[in-house]
């Protein structure tokens, strides 16, 4: 999660700053209440089956996978703390990459508890407070600013140019333990009721008068807006910032050289939401299938744009951090940025109005 403003491309080489829309539910209506009362369901695009597929085939399994990855990272760092060998260091780094990849696939549904209860910030704030992190080892994690914990704080210590010291290794275990706690907490909030209903139930109750989503389209708007925001962030900020300034250290996972994997997993997460499931094939009632049935021209356009964006992302030479300055690298990055922005634009201009 990047917490600064975003750059967007205008023409080929001109850039300007726009704010990211991270939590907006409605466009074209003045406020949430107006959205629910005034934005009619002119198209029966979103069904209960669409929402259930999104929740049970994508969101919950993805978060369960993230929690498992965080647990494995914590265990790998505990092993490395006890036996600081080169092999254990590499195993811990690989565990971080795996957990990170899984997390990046959830960027397009970072609403609900991830946003409102602070899980996203606690796990993925960037940039981090590097100076503060150096002095934070003795501070309880729950008392820290988000910029001193999470994936990128672990990355900073684990992938440093010099091997982690004893103090660093101890600190890494503390950070990983908190990451696991946050990831498991996010799973719990989606699956289990406490003083509040499970967020899974909140979304599945869409269309009920007492629901946070009084119409199916209200839930559909949340889902589509999440896709728009995530892909817009990838194009305008995660890629756009470093591309504009030609400063590789502005890539979010610069220290680990994992940025390209981040971006590819952002694409994969959006593709999973569009298809309504994480495995191969199209889930019944998915956004993709509903568009194919009701708006086949839009569906065909999106399918092609997703494919083009994937091809462009996978064509960027690795690592992106060291290839940005090369002519080939710059062209490849710009091509990918343009392709991803096209997907976001179609979702925003052609799909979002159908669910408002």
UniProtKB/Swiss-Prot annotation:
Cleavable signal peptide: 1-44
Chief place where the protein resides: membrane
Induction: By iron deprivation.
Pfam families with a match to the protein in the record: Peptidase_M75
Keyword annotations of the record: Cell inner membrane, Cell membrane, Iron, Membrane, Signal, Transmembrane
Source organism superkingdom: Bacteria
GO CC term (a single one): plasma membrane
Region (Hydrophilic): 75-145, 240-310
Subcellular location: Cell inner membrane
InterPro entries given in the database record: Imelysin-like, Imelysin-like_IrpA, Imelysin_sf
Protein task: IrpA occurs under iron-deficient growth conditions in cyanobacterium Synechococcus and disappears in cells recovering from iron starvation. It seems to be involved in iron acquisition, uptake or storage.
Subunit structure: The iron-regulated protein A is one unit of the protein complex CPVI-4, which is synthesized under iron deficient conditions.
Name this protein carries in UniProt: Iron-regulated protein A
